[in-house]
């Protein structure tokens, strides 16, 4: 029985050691920039790895995202042509967004929100949604 326990302990330690080595090799840094809808400056895609575009809001019917300045969002996602490694996310919420809690409390509203998030991801070629 003692040898079985020792064998299991050795196996567990081996797995943990492999996991630690695997994690230590991943030293890629994330450089994230928040970009607002009202700005004019674009971040350098050779420096940043991720851009969070601020903001989109839950609309009054809970069925559609209201994206501030869609034209600017398109300019941001166009940077991915120059820098394919770049990830662009749409930040939903923010200080002035008051409808998110209402949407999250209702299953039907959550489903509509999720579908419209998927639409926005496809339409603007986003890499994800950031819930702010």
PLM ranges: what are they?
Residues 10, 53, 131:
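Short beta-strand and adjacent tight-turn residues that come in two discontinuous sequence segments
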Residues 1-27:
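Bacterial Sec-dependent N-terminal signal peptides
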Residues 25-121:
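Glycan-recognition patch characteristic of GH18 chitinases/ENGases
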